[in-house]
Amino acid sequence: LGTLFPGLFAVVGPSAGWISFATYGGNPFPAETSPFYWARRSSDTPRYVENLTHRAVYIIHGDADDNVPISQAYTMKGYIEPYVTDLQFHVEPGAGHWWDGDKAGGADCVDWPELFATMDDRRLDPWESEFVFVSPSPWVSPTHSFVTVQSAATPAADLRVTSSQDGDTITVTTDNVRNLTLSAEGLNANEATVVIVDGESYPVGEEDIWIGPAEGKT
């Protein structure tokens, strides 16, 4: 959920987590050119870790877990490290899938104090203007910050939206996006007066901005 909906989470904190059905359940993904893969692509978690670039991640795992192998945690950590600088990783020696100690009032594996301290300390900007958003499709995850993708050019590829801000100008570039809307509330929250989308400039006013075909596929 954190990789697909980064606009909803300031912190992602998996405890004894597994990566995907393909890595944990033993059912490999079809070829990426297959429509069956396109339908399952949203569960291919490593494809979307770039969405966590400006988020905190706290991974917890017992090194004797006989349910979800700790290799799942180490592998996911490897995927995350190129993008996430706010990364913490706790391995509990000798612990299985469910474990407890004396650090938390509840079970330590789910009430780990350092994880909750991290959650208390981090804040989410709902209208962030500096981001990369990658989604398997608009029918899975269409919105991040002020951008909502209405339709993709093809279901065979992820859609990608990159945003940056310089002064009162926000610049957005897209890939595999057929049409989208930009929230006036979100743009104004960033005090933007101009937004540039794929090289075209649009003035920021009080109305949402629709870009791309208004008819056809959805």
Give short role names for the model-derived ranges.
Residues 19-20, 64-65, 177:
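Short, solvent-exposed loop/turn segments at secondary-structure junctions
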Residues 16, 61, 172:
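The conserved beta1-alpha1 loop
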Residues 23-120:
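The feature captures the conserved acid-bearing segment of alpha/beta-hydrolase catalytic domains
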Residues 1-7, 12:
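Short glycine-enriched nucleophile-adjacent loop
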Residues 5, 16, 119-123:
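Sec/Tat-exported extracytoplasmic proteins
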